[in-house]
């Protein structure tokens, strides 16, 4: 598990939020499970494109960047299972070989899929909901 330097400060993209927490980046499910078992307070962090203090903590910030890509897909249902740390800018490229695509996407594509889902990222169009509305399950 990668652990960021203790003196490193995490900041959101606008610089309006910051945190001096220990940032951890597990690469295996077992590391993630161990982290959850041994820490009472964990905040997930991605690209930091939220203005709200969602990631503000003095304890542990969890970065899921190593959990990326498509795990499984169902061509008939045009559904796929995607890992939480997948960045939106990679998701389109990942979906192309399986003839799938996002029906709608926000202007900014730096977010992780988990971040886009949890912060209400949306695209344009009166009839198109935010990305979270397309989630079938976790």
Feature names for model-found ranges:
Residues 116-138:
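FAD-binding subdomain of flavoenzyme oxidoreductases
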Residues 14-110, 117-125:
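Glycine-rich N-terminal segment of FAD-binding domains in flavoprotein oxidoreductases
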Residues 3-12:
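N-terminal regions that are enriched for targeting/export leaders
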Residues 9, 18-20, 134:
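Short loop/turn motifs at secondary-structure junctions
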């Amino acid at each position: 598990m990668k652990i960021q330097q203790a003196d490193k400060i995490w900041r959101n993209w606008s610089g309006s939020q910051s945190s001096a927490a220990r940032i951890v980046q597990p690469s295996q499910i077992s590391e993630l499970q161990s982290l959850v078992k041994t820490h009472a307070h964990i905040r997930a962090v991605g690209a930091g494109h939220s203005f709200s203090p969602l990631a503000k903590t003095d304890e542990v910030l969890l970065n899921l960047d190593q959990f990326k890509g498509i795990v499984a897909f169902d061509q008939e249902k045009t559904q796929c299972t995607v890992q939480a740390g997948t960045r939106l800018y990679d998701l389109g490229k990942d979906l192309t070989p399986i003839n799938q695509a996002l029906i709608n996407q926000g202007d900014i594509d730096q977010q992780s899929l988990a971040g886009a889902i949890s912060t209400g990222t949306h695209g344009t169009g009166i009839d198109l909901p935010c990305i979270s509305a397309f989630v079938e399950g976790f």
